[in-house]
């Protein structure tokens, strides 16, 4: 249980900062983009029974599920990073890991995940464009990495 607390806290912080960016200055919010993509992928024959079962709130359930999915994915990535950090602490290589983790997470989101969600590379297809997407995800990834690498060690 102790191994999951710091990565889970980092994931919650990253998701909360992302939401703050969305509502404060209109930055991108991955769970929102994922829910939009999810609804475009569901065929009409499958969507009708889902809508009957869950009613009007079905889009909110999907949105909540996407938030939980993002937190879970960031927690799993964080647990893997923390394991690697614990192995490298003896050699003193953990100090540079913050920058490596932050840049890797930001690059994965901006170059890998956003294009899959039809947002373009670095959020070019979003209303705010890359001028909002890049700073938002750099701050999110930097905060996430800082909590992961500065949190209590095992």
What label would you give each PLM region?
Residues 47-69:
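Hydrophobic alpha-helical transmembrane segments
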Residues 2-27:
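N-terminal signal-anchor transmembrane alpha helix
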Residues 61-72, 76-77, 93-153:
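Membrane-embedded alpha-helical segments of integral membrane proteins
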Residues 23, 27, 82, 86-87, ...:
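Transmembrane helix-loop junctions in multipass membrane proteins, especially transporters and channels
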């Amino acid at each position: 249980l102790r191994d999951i607390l710091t990565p889970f806290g980092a994931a919650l912080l990253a998701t909360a900062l992302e939401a703050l960016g969305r509502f404060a200055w209109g930055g991108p919010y991955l769970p929102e983009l994922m829910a939009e993509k999810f609804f475009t992928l569901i065929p009409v024959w499958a969507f009708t029974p889902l809508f009957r079962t869950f009613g009007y709130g079905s889009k909110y359930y999907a949105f909540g599920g996407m938030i939980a999915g993002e937190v879970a994915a960031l927690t799993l990535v964080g647990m893997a990073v923390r394991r690697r950090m614990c192995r490298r602490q003896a050699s003193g290589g953990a100090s540079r890991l913050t920058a490596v983790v932050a840049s890797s997470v930001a690059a994965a989101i901006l170059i890998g995940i956003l294009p899959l969600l039809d947002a373009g590379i670095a959020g070019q297809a979003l209303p705010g464009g890359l001028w909002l997407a890049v700073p938002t995800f750099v701050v999110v990834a930097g905060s996430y990495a800082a909590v992961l690498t500065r949190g209590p060690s095992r």
